[in-house]
Amino acid sequence: MNYATITYYAIANGPCGRTSVFVSGCRHRCPGCFNSVAWDFAYGQPFDKATRNQVFASCQPDYIAGLSLLGGEPFEPENQRELLPFVRNFKALYPNKTVWCYSGYTWEQLTGKEPCAARCEVTDELLQLLDVLVDGEFVQAKHDISLRFRGSSNQRLLDVPRTLAAGQPVWWEDEKVFATHTMEGN
């Protein structure tokens, strides 16, 4: 698996400071995608052991809340197979830090309730390791810059442990100060 870029101390892809890994490879090709350069699976650099260790080290400080996986598309089967052991190791190293993942696939597709070519032998385990899944393709016509941690209004921020326990999608709950935020100056 290749990665397009890694952003350290990011604040746009989940709460607090995070390390964001943008994997390469995406078959969605959403019009208006902010990272279309990462559609190509061959783009970027190999996500090798040295890079993984650098990501792990970057998450060590207490002020880093966790890891965010973006793309490209983390849930392309080729990427899932590489990300699973990486996320497993991350959770073992940092059990109190969160893992957020952005996917153009929906929860229903990834869990097999709807047809999905991305579902493979590691999908369920990878989902279980996530804290939040931001699901759904970016839709240019639903683009809204006032949305926190997502680009278009069709995308959902799902609390994965609560979703798994409930057997249906459960939205992630933002801190109250941010949950009532609007861009209208209220």
Where are these regions (language model features)?
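Core AdoMet radical
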Residues: N35-A50, D62-P77, K91-A118, L127-A141, ...
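N-terminal [4Fe-4S]-dependent radical SAM core
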Residues: M1-F22, R27, P31, N35-Y43, ...
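P-loop/Walker A phosphate-binding loop and immediately adjacent motor/lid segment at beta-alpha junctions
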Residues: F86-K91, H143-N186
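A generic local structural motif
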Residues: I6-Y8, N53-V55, R119-E121
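Alpha-helical scaffolding segments of alpha/beta enzyme cores, especially the outer helices
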Residues: Q54-A57, E82-A92, E125
